[in-house]
């Protein structure tokens, strides 16, 4: 049995998947590891690239080729459950690692620090098509130790491609995980409910800002198929996840979650304003303001003023006589 399983989900990553796989194969370790790839019925040649690599590395690569598109979270869960290692590392098919010692560094840390359940590291963020230099995800001054409370209040403690965690921290998955619209933040919450998170400030990977954001595109397609609205979908998903967390933790951390809730309402207000749906923009702006003044001001004064403007604009726009 391998000590580490690398869990890689992919969909329409023909241009990037080889680089992702090669960055796994270059790892220098003193333990066995496997690469488990969940290929979600891509419409390009991603599958062919994966099969080519699998045939060359039969002892290292295990490919799960879906006959129909499952969607991001079901594909992730299926791939995750196929991982047998004591530790699991995440890497999506359009990201890649840059440090050949990445796995060893993170696993060694977890082996020597049993009160930690997960580790992350700094990464470069590469914006597709941009000529700008890559920026760092969290930077070198990000706090070294994060707790459950930190992850609930401030969100992700690291890019997906930086995460290595103990399998026993999340398996078996709780039933609610199967209903999630997205899995990154909840996975970190599950892990930090069992131990602390350690952050390496050194850059050991590259997170590619999604060219077409395949995971989001899948979610939007599925919403359209159900006749659901797609405006502000990521932020609506955040609100759904917050509700799940509240129920899971029996509302012990509701106040901490207000930070994420307020930002979700803030972003929804802006998206509806941009789409000139002023009644809905006002609804979310008022929700954000209500939470701010009901708890304490997470948003800057500038953003609070922006929300008030959205409310006033919505009243003005809806009071205009029809043309």
Give residue ranges: language-model regions:
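Conserved donor NDP-sugar-binding/catalytic core segment of glycosyltransferases
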Residues: 101-134
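Short aromatic/hydrophobic "clamp" motif used to bind/position activated sugar donors
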Residues: 88
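Glycine-rich, basic loop-to-helix element that forms the pyrophosphate-binding segment
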Residues: 66-83, 105
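Conserved nucleotide-sugar donor-binding catalytic segment
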Residues: 81, 121, 139-226
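A conserved acidic beta->alpha catalytic loop
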Residues: 39-48, 68, 92
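Catalytic core of nucleotide-sugar-dependent glycosyltransferases
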Residues: 146, 150, 203, 207-211, ...
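Cell-envelope/extracellular polymer assembly enzymes that use nucleotide-activated donors
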Residues: 2-5, 34, 186
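Short, acidic, metal-binding catalytic loop of nucleotide-sugar glycosyltransferases
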Residues: 22-32
């Amino acid at each position: 049995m391998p000590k580490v399983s690398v869990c890689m989900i992919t969909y329409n990553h023909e241009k990037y998947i080889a680089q992702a796989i090669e960055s796994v194969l270059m790892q220098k370790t003193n333990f066995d590891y496997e690469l488990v790839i969940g290929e979600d019925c891509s419409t390009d040649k991603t599958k062919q690239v994966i099969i080519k690599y699998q045939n060359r590395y039969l002892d290292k690569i295990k490919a799960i080729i879906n006959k129909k598109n499952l969607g991001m979270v079901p594909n992730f869960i299926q791939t995750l459950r196929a991982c047998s290692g004591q530790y699991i590392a995440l890497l999506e098919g359009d990201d890649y690692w840059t440090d050949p010692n990445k796995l060893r560094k993170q696993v060694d840390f977890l082996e020597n620090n049993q009160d930690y359940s997960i580790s992350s590291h700094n990464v470069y963020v590469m914006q597709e098509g941009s000529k700008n230099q890559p920026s760092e995800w969290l930077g070198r001054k990000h706090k070294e130790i994060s707790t459950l409370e930190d992850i609930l209040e401030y969100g992700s403690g690291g890019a997906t491609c930086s995460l290595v965690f103990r399998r026993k921290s999340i398996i078996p998955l709780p039933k609610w995980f199967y209903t999630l619209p997205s899995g990154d933040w909840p996975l970190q919450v599950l892990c930090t409910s069992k131990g602390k998170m350690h952050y390496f400030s050194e850059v050991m990977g590259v997170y590619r800002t999604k060219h077409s954001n395949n995971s989001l595109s899948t979610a939007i397609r599925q919403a359209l198929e159900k006749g659901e609205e797609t405006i502000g979908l990521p932020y609506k998903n955040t609100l759904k996840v917050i509700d799940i967390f509240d129920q899971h933790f029996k509302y012990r951390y509701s106040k901490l979650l207000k930070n994420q809730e307020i930002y979700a309402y803030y972003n929804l207000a802006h998206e509806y304003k941009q789409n000139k749906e002023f009644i809905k923009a006002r609804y979310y702006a008022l929700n954000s303001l209500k939470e701010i003044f009901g708890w304490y001001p997470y948003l800057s004064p500038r953003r609070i003023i922006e929300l008030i403007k959205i409310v006033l604009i919505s009243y003005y726009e809806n009071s205009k006589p029809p043309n």
